[in-house]
UniProtKB/Swiss-Prot annotation:
Protein name per the record: Acetylcholine receptor subunit beta-type acr-2
Keyword Membrane: yes
InterPro entries hit by this protein: Neur_chan_lig-bd, Neur_chan_lig-bd_sf, Neur_channel, Neuro-gated_channel_TM_sf, Neuro_actylchol_rec, Neurotrans-gated_channel_TM, Neurotransmitter_ion_chnl_CS, Nicotinic_acetylcholine_rcpt
Intrachain disulfide bonds: C185-C199
An example Gene Ontology CC term for this record: acetylcholine-gated channel complex
Pfam families registered for this protein in UniProt: Neur_chan_LBD, Neur_chan_memb
PROSITE patterns reported in the protein's UniProt record: NEUROTR_ION_CHANNEL (PS00236)
Protein's cellular compartments: Postsynaptic cell membrane; Cell membrane
NCBIfam families tied to this protein: LIC
Membrane topology of the entry: Multi-pass membrane protein
Transmembrane segments: 271-291, 299-319, 331-351, 528-548
Signal peptide: 1-20
Amino acid sequence: MKKTVKILLILITVFLKVHCNGGHDDEAADFLSHTNIDDPNNSSDPNKNSDQGDTMGEDEDRLVIDLFREYNFLIRPVKNVSSPPVVVDFGVAMILLINVDEKNQILQTNVWLTMKWNDFQLAWNPAEYGNISNLHVPSDRVWLPDIVLFNNADGNYEVSFKSNVFVDHHGDVTWVPPAMFKSSCRIDVEWFPFDEQCCTLVFGSWTYNSEEVRLHWYNNIQAVQLHDYSYSGIWDVIDVPGQLVHKPDLKENKMVFNVVIRRKTLFYTVILIIPTVLMAFLSVMAFYLPVDSGEKVSLTISLLLALVVFLLLVSKILPPTSNIPLMGKYLLLAFVLNITAVVGTVVIVNIYFRSALSHKMPTWVRKVFLEFLPHLLVMKRPERIPIFNGYFVEEYCASEIFDASLVMPSMTATMLPFLQVTTNLKAASSTSSGQSSEHHENCSKWKKRLSIRMSKRRAPRARLDDDSEDIIDDTNGNHVDSLQEKISKEMKTTVEAIAYIAEHMKREMSLKKMRDDWKYVAMVLDRLILLIFFGVTLGGTLGIICSAPHVFDFVDQEAIISKLNAKYLPSDMYS
């Protein structure tokens, strides 16, 4: 019985000792488990058996236990309510510009945030702890300023990776967490694709006002740090200034960083600008295409459809803002010019196929398009030389049209007298009735030339018989009636048929001449519109594209980064 009581007393004593000592060391033991600092009492590493290792481990273990024995990471590190605000030195270093989503107006960046503040509870005397001057502890064990990105675009306001904090013996805490932010950025598409954007990163405390937590520049660097920046293949960084905004009346304190970037235009120049410019000038060449090819309207409509595709492409890239992008303006100009080209082509085709039977050419059209504009456009029209039975004649004369030498060079000598009789009869009839029988001023000249040509081509004709000579001699005077009676019915029919054929050919040549006039009007109009469209297209191309402020600027990204580092970084950091 006595032995049982002694055993119970011993167990109660052990239980009380364990309970009292265990509660005291719970917090330190839990912290050690997170900081990877081994408990010297439970160490299984044989290397820790050395004197130096034991001393270091014991000092660090003791330091951690002493620092966090009564430390509360939920309380702002101030001694009392009336103490000054906690000053947080804040800085941003941009590592990579990942993407600029123009459609959704989002800037995606990879940055390193730098925050430094003083926590008086984490100060110690290094001499008391084996000259240990700093510690690396988990960030969830110390108080952290709740600084977030205000203009966040994806709902993730905090950093994704909570790195360790660096604590020195003065109580200064430095935290450098990496973060990948998606921030809202107002995209100005007015000069696309030669655009320059200014995106902002706004940081501040989410719950503390300026009387509780106040932001200052880290190392007095009033800009985004670029010393570890990796160049982007799409955008060039132009400037990265920062601004500290402090509004005492609103107790507001925040930092605004402006990231000025400029687009690299080579990709869009090759993919978008050059094809659009070529299509615009190709629509001009539609007016150089002959109407007879039948492809003028098809070419202009095909180009119109291609421009519609490019317009849809630009609309899918850019956001639907109130500003019209530069490329949109040029595509709109090319679109309007192409529609005008379709209308002009239809009008030209309509004019080209007009004839004297359907349209009568007005006098002003003849003067403007056949006389004035050809000289102005340096267009020389070929001489109108109709072809009649293989011989070149400038114009037809009423008297010579029935001459057998002009109509049928191979006609036999027997029929020639009768044709000459008919010609002389018409001439005599015109003279007797008081009508003018004067020929065109060139008729005699052409008649003489044709007589020479005809004499070289045909053999000497047989002499006319006596009856024929008598008929020819008797055509003058009062023997007209008697001579007509001697002509046989067959000869009359032949002469009338030849006269009808000649008259029909004369009429066809006259109609052809009028059709050629309409065709020439269409050619002049084609040339006029071609020059106008070429001038408008060239002027519009140069005027719209060259109006961009940075179209001819060359950006040396390495030189700009070096210049910005020299401008914003302290001399000791830059060197």
